Every structure is written in structure tokens, then in C-alpha cells.
Amino acid sequence: VVARKSFLENSPKEVPTMLRYDTYLKKNSLYNTPPAFGIYMVGKVVSWIKANGGLEAMAKKNAAKAKLVYDAIDNSDGFYVGHADKDSRSFMNVTFRLPSEELEAKFAKEALEHGLGGVKGHRSVGGMRTSIYNAMPMEGCQALVDFMEKFRKANK
């Protein structure tokens, strides 16, 4: 930034420290090193979202993926039971329980054998947690649902 020193010295005090020119003037531009890798990664993610239709398209895709998995839970005749109330369900992390902890352990083991890793729930909550973040394709969610149905039929 090229500016008169008197202008830089009179930064409004209500402006956050990191956004005030006088902060950097007093510290010879060395007040803080920006998190370069984090900034780089945010740029990559934003570019990817734009290339894939933008936020509206991403929201539609995520809603469709979540619906697919939640429908498998809701239509399982009680074999799978969701943790969250229907009006509070996440589009990113679908959590559910099985009839017993033994079946949950078996589900996690067999899911891994079918290429579906990381489905074990949080240690304080238990059950299953399937993460279907933005980059997870619909095909991955369909593979999960297919496995869930196969597992349910074999273990009901």
C-alpha cells in the first residue's frame, strides 16, 4: 500500500486490528503472517465449487445425496435409526444406529471391506457416521445405500 503516513496513522479504532493500516505501520508490515496454505486451499475449493455449478448447484447435489441416504435409513423398517430429528438432519454427516453394538461393529468392518471407510460414529455418541461432504459423488452415496440394504437383509 502506498499512502501518506498521516493517513495510515489515523486508522479508525472500530476497525478490527488485522484490517487497520496503522497496525502494519507500527510493526513494519510484520504484524502477522497470513496463513498462506489455508488461503491457497480456500481458493482451490472456491474454484472447484464454481466449476461445479456454484453454491446453488452444490446445495441441490448435497440435498439429493442426503435424501438418498436418509431414505435408506427411514425405509429400513427400524433396522437403521437416525440420531437427529428429521428437521435437524445434516446434509454433510449422516448419523444412525443399528439394533446392537455388535451389529454396528460388524457394519463398520464389512463396510470397510466394501471400500466404505470411516463409517464408525464419534466415540462419545457411537453408532455410524457417514460423511458425504461436497466432493463425495452421488455414486459414493449410492454405493453406501446399496451396502446398507445388503447388510440389512443379511442381518435382520
Located regions from the model:
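Active-site C-terminal subdomain of aminotransferase-like
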Residues: V2-Y70, D85, A154-K156
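Short beta-strand-to-loop capping motifs
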Residues: A3, F96-S100, I132-N134
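Short, flexible, solvent-exposed loop/turn segments with mixed acidic/basic and small polar residues
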Residues: W48, G82-D87, V119-H122
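Short amphipathic beta-strand starts and helix->beta connectors
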Residues: I73-Y80, A111-G117
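Conserved PLP-binding catalytic core of the aspartate aminotransferase-like
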Residues: Y80-A111
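Short amphipathic alpha-helices in soluble, non-transmembrane regions
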Residues: A105-H114, A143-E149
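Conserved PLP cofactor-binding pocket of PLP-dependent enzymes
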Residues: H114-I132
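PLP-dependent enzyme catalytic core of the Aspartate aminotransferase-like
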Residues: G126-K156
